[in-house]
């Protein structure tokens, strides 16, 4: 089977659905890694699989990483410079995604109180899906939020599906995604520090 990207497959979720449909019901859980996130550690994926295995009603799970001050500063600097950088996520107490944006959400302009945790979560470009959620996804039309933000996971939200946000820990590793040319040196340095240069 040729798994290469076809022009009719607009995003990774659609490509995963096409592969799942072609293979048939062999695999109930499909994991999607995105090529712009080479620093994604294996425990992020393990957390997704654990979350989806623990909840039979969970159709989609994706990792989120609480921003430290350096990551938040990177997001805010990208915005000030007019660059679209990574994606941020907000979710409820049960981990159900409320919204994903290429803007920094929630608003951070009020300043932080001493000892307060940064409430901004970096959405990591990886997903675990149940097969039925993928097949539903490709039957739905692209909505205005997905179109405006350019974020495929918003199609689930726009159609009333739950996207489970699974909080993960960096465990001392630098995590950043390749969104702009200026991200290349940062990612190369992180890979070198992990002995992968």
Predicted regions and their residues:
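One-carbon transfer enzymes
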Residues: 4-13, 17, 21, 80-86, ...
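Residues that recognize and position ribonucleotide moieties
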Residues: 31, 38, 89, 127, ...
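Conserved alpha/beta core of the MobA/IspD/sugar-nucleotide pyrophosphorylase nucleotidyltransferase superfamily
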Residues: 25, 100, 109-110, 114-197
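Short phosphate-binding loop-to-helix
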Residues: 1-50
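Conserved core of the sugar-phosphate nucleotidyltransferase
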Residues: 41-140
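Conserved beta-strand segments of alpha/beta enzyme cores
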Residues: 1-2, 96, 162-164
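Short beta-strands and strand-loop turn motifs
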Residues: 4, 30-33, 63, 137, ...
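Structured catalytic cores of enzymes that bind and process phosphorylated ligands/cofactors
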Residues: 7-10, 27, 55-63, 159, ...
């Amino acid at each position: 089977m040729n798994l290469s990207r076809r022009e009719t497959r607009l995003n990774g979720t659609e490509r995963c659905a096409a592969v799942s449909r072609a293979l048939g019901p062999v695999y109930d859980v499909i994991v999607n890694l995105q090529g712009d996130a080479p620093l994604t550690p294996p425990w992020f994926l393990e957390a997704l699989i654990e979350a989806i295995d623990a909840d039979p009603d969970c159709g989609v799970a994706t990792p989120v990483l609480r921003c430290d001050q350096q990551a938040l500063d990177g997001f805010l600097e990208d915005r000030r410079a007019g660059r679209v950088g990574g994606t941020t996520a907000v979710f409820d107490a049960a981990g159900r995604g409320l919204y994903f944006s290429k803007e920094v959400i929630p608003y951070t302009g009020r300043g932080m109180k001493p000892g307060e945790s940064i409430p901004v979560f970096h959405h990591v470009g990886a997903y675990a899906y149940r097969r039925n959620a993928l097949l539903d996804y490709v039957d739905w039309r692209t909505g205005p939020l997905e179109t405006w933000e350019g974020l495929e996971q918003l199609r689930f939200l726009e159609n009333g599906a739950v996207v489970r946000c699974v909080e993960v820990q960096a465990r001392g590793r630098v995590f950043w995604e390749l969104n702009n040319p200026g991200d290349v040196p940062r990612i190369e340095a992180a890979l070198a520090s992990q002995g992968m240069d």
